[in-house]
Amino acid sequence: MDSFLRLLIHGASGRMGQALLRLASEDPSFQVAAAVVGQAPDRHVSDGVPFFAAAELAAVPAFDVAIDFSLPQGFSSLLALCVARAVPLVSGTTGLDSRQHEALVMAGAQIPLVWGSNFSVGMAVLVNLVERAGDALSGWDCDIVESHHVHKQDAPSGSALTLGEAVACKGIAPRYTSLRAGDIVGDHLVQFTGLGERIELVHRATNRDVFARGALYVARRVVGRVPGCYRVRDLIM
């Protein structure tokens, strides 16, 4: 039996994909079976890793788990491939539409999968703290401010929406503010405001590696689990 997991990286040309390629190559518990990029790759093999264009997805070799940080346009094809091959999927692709989220839930009846807007340990803790604050602060105002680099397309960020869901389930309607500036990796502020006082909970990511390490950790943990839709914090905390 192999001592490593064969990993498919989907969205390998993006910032997260590049971090995953680098960190997975340094981790003896993984072997990158294939890397998928949007357009035809410049080189079909790089550092021993075979690269495939998104249109060639069906041709990728066997893999034990897929990690996806891509765009919504390519997500559905990967989900279908993982279901067809009965392989777990870990996805951090944000901006999915309602039909894609429904497809995720349906796929969870057949394979173990994790969709998350943020794979850092700190964000998992922040979501937990926000839920607990929501329990204690009913009637307070809640504002969520997220800041990211200028190239991030979706707003509010997926992480901001996850934080918003954590307070919305407590009966609090959050307001969102999105900032796009410079090369900010990811800042999230959750502010609860009452009469004469306020509480601020903040998470700042200064290096994209925290998300990639978290995704690799979750990928190791989800392999071998029964089919279902798992939360990041189910596997990190």
Swiss-Prot record:
Q: Where does NAD(+) bind?
A: G11, A12, S13, G14, R15, M16, G92, T93, T94, G116, S117, N118, F119
Catalytic reaction annotation: (S)-2,3,4,5-tetrahydrodipicolinate + NAD(+) + H2O = (2S,4S)-4-hydroxy-2,3,4,5-tetrahydrodipicolinate + NADH + H(+); (S)-2,3,4,5-tetrahydrodipicolinate + NADP(+) + H2O = (2S,4S)-4-hydroxy-2,3,4,5-tetrahydrodipicolinate + NADPH + H(+)
| Active site as annotated | H148, K152
Report the domain of life of the source organism: Bacteria
Indicate which residues the UniProt annotation says bind (S)-2,3,4,5-tetrahydrodipicolinate: H149, G158, S159
Which GO cellular component term is one of those annotated? cytosol
Q: Which GO terms describe its biological process?
A: diaminopimelate biosynthetic process; lysine biosynthetic process via diaminopimelate
InterPro entries given in the database record = DapB_C, DapB_N, DapB_N_CS, DHDPR_bac, NAD(P)-bd_dom_sf
What pathway is this protein a component of? Answer: Amino-acid biosynthesis; L-lysine biosynthesis via DAP pathway; (S)-tetrahydrodipicolinate from L-aspartate: step 4/4
Looking up Pfam families in the UniProt record yields:
DapB_C, DapB_N
Q: Record's PANTHER family?
A: 4-HYDROXY-TETRAHYDRODIPICOLINATE REDUCTASE 1, CHLOROPLASTIC-RELATED, DIHYDRODIPICOLINATE REDUCTASE
Q: What does this protein do?
A: Catalyzes the conversion of 4-hydroxy-tetrahydrodipicolinate (HTPA) to tetrahydrodipicolinate.
Q: What is this protein called?
A: 4-hydroxy-tetrahydrodipicolinate reductase
Record organism: Xylella fastidiosa (strain 9a5c)
